A protein has these predicted regions:
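Hydrophobic transmembrane signal anchors and adjacent membrane-proximal interface regions, especially
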Residues: 4, 43-50, 64-66, 126, ...
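Extracytoplasmic cysteine-anchoring/structural motifs
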Residues: 20-27, 74, 78-166
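Bacterial Sec-dependent N-terminal signal peptides
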Residues: 1-32
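Start-of-domain marker
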Residues: 21-82
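Short, intrinsically disordered low-complexity segments
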Residues: 1-2, 53, 108
Length: 166
């Protein structure tokens, strides 16, 4: 009798622990687009600030996502969950003259809801459909990887800046 109760207790313990999930949710499920400098300018000597307009109808209201970045070769930009097109304002201040140049970058994308587990927060992945820019300080921007998730290592965009003649 004692042997049966030990077996029953052991079986109950195995079933109880077997029912628990061991799924680890990602800690950082915010999705960022990675931008890498390419072309003649491989490291940013000037100062870069990037902002996102809060409201498309109001030019004076924006959110700064990168403030005075310098001496870098790459950056990460957050992507919106609901908009089909994200707009970024790149303000580049020349380090020798202080002259500021602002370019606008439009990223057209498809939003894809991503579900891992009921225990995890929802995430939104994206497929980049197109990118365009003004050409004041930015020469061009190219799509390098069109799938944006939260564990990408390959840059999504290659950013070509115009060569400065100081």
């Amino acid at each position: 009798m004692r042997r049966i109760s030990l077996y029953t207790l052991a079986a109950a313990a195995v079933m109880t622990f077997g029912a628990c999930t061991t799924f680890d949710c990602p800690l950082y499920n915010k999705v960022y687009a990675k931008v890498k400098l390419a072309g003649d300018v491989k490291t940013l000597a000037d100062t870069l600030s990037v902002s996102i307009p809060r409201n498309m109808d109001d030019d004076g209201s924006d959110t700064v996502v990168i403030n005075r970045l310098t001496a870098t070769d790459s950056l990460s930009l957050p992507m919106s969950y609901q908009r089909d097109e994200d707009i970024y304002l790149f303000c580049i201040s020349q380090y020798k003259t202080g002259v500021k140049t602002t370019d606008t970058v439009w990223v057209e994308k498809q939003n894809l809801p991503h579900f891992e587990s009921v225990d995890c927060n929802p995430a939104m992945f994206h497929t980049i459909k197109g990118v365009r820019t003004t050409h004041h300080a930015i020469d061009s921007i190219k799509i390098n990887n069109d799938k944006v998730t939260y564990n990408d290592t390959k840059p999504h965009f290659l950013l070509y800046l115009k060569e400065r003649n100081y």
